[in-house]
Design a protein with these regions (language model features):
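Alpha-helix N-cap/helix-start motif at helix boundaries, enriched for small hydrophobics
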Residues: 91, 153-154, 161, 165-170, ...
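Catalytic-site neighborhood detector that most strongly recognizes the C-terminal catalytic loop/helix
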Residues: 124, 276-310
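Conserved tyrosine-mediated DNA breakage-rejoining catalytic core shared by Y-recombinases
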Residues: 169-207
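Basic, Lys/Arg- and aromatic-enriched nucleic-acid-binding interface segment
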Residues: 132-160, 164
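Active-site/catalytic core of tyrosine-dependent DNA strand-transfer enzymes
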Residues: 202-246, 258
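N-terminal core-binding DNA-recognition domain of tyrosine recombinases/integrases
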Residues: 2-5, 20-121, 140
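DNA breakage-rejoining catalytic core of tyrosine-based enzymes
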Residues: 118-135, 194-205
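Short basic/aromatic active-site micro-motif
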Residues: 148-149, 246-266, 276-282
Length: 310
């Protein structure tokens, strides 16, 4: 299969020149800046290891294995198992592209052994625990001394799967109550490098109702949650304790629980990735974990074979 970005490349093309074309291909395919930077960084390291005039058709399986051995043991720069596994993924992706595009006759990376990483599974809330926490948060909301903060914080993370840093950065201006497809929260980033993480996520009717009450209770200025990160962690922990949950409820646990709920609901995997605001490379590991967590929440198997996130 020949693609436009590799059509002018042949066995005599040097590795640096081929990488320029690969960057164009990745960009045209809609890969995130994070993915492109990671993949190109790994292949530029290979280019610095090989002779500068080495042609792509001359690169062999032995060259790649020697490169990986050098990176692990001789470079004198730490290379964790997760980093090594990601770099092998980069090699396989690049040489597969060359081979499928007709630039090389054989794929030297095809038989490179992928290194697996035993990565601990995150702890998530069961559906019953989620129900108990939401019921407790509703009691806070409807009690004689109403507390809207706990309900708003927990349900926001559960509905949207946003990260702690994203939650702390939210302002009331990021809540759009009049969007054409229904109320939403706009996750924004100041840095252009992180613009690919920006996304608009829908909000439930119950959350919007609580939000109106919350704005009456708290005089909000430029932050939706005007407290420190640690204080909000305590809010989630205390909510879990009051609901009788033995696990330590955290931002990360709520984010993973949100993703597992979406996975179990059969939502398209790419939509889950976009909702979480992560790259294709990161989602390779995360999707495996979501599959395992969705299949079994018994807590008996706490590790899995997976490709690392970058």
């Amino acid at each position: 299969m020949i693609n436009e970005s590799s059509a002018h490349i042949n066995t005599r093309t040097t590795l640096p020149s081929a990488l320029l074309a690969w960057e164009i291909f990745l960009t045209d395919q809609g890969s995130s800046p994070h993915t492109i930077t990671a993949f190109l960084g790994d292949l530029h390291l290979l280019a610095s290891y090989l002779p500068p005039d080495r042609q792509v058709g001359e690169i062999s399986l032995a060259d790649l294995n020697n490169f990986l051995r050098w990176m692990e043991n001789e470079r004198n720069v730490p290379c964790s198992p997760k980093t090594l596994a990601r770099r092998i993924t980069s090699l396989k992706s690049f040489f597969r592209w060359l081979h499928e595009g007709g630039a090389i006759q054989a794929n030297p990376a095809e038989k490179v052994v992928q290194k697996s990483v035993r990565s601990p599974l995150p702890e998530v809330l069961t559906p019953d625990e989620v129900t108990r926490i939401i019921d407790t948060a509703r009691e806070y909301r409807q009690g004689p001394d109403p507390d809207l903060r706990s309900f708003l914080l927990f349900t926001l993370i559960l509905e949207t799967g946003i990260k702690k840093g994203e939650c702390l950065s939210l302002s009331p201006n990021h809540i759009n109550l009049d969007a054409s497809n229904g109320p939403l929260v706009f996750i924004r980033y100041a840095s252009p490098q992180n613009r690919y993480k920006e996304r608009k996520l829908p909000l439930s009717e119950e959350w919007i109702e609580a939000y109106h009450e919350y704005r009456v209770q708290y005089q909000l200025d430029d932050r939706l949650f005007p407290w420190s990160a640690r204080m909000l962690e305590y809010v989630l922990e205390d909510l879990g304790k009051d609901a009788g949950i033995t696990k330590r409820v955290s931002f990360s646990m709520c984010r993973w629980t949100s993703a597992v709920q979406d996975w179990r609901s059969g939502i398209d995997q790419n939509k889950i990735r976009q909702k979480l605001g992560i790259s294709e490379v990161q989602f390779r590991e995360i999707s495996r974990k979501l599959h395992t967590l969705s299949r079994d929440q018994s807590g008996e198997d706490l590790t899995e074979e997976s490709t690392p996130e970058s």
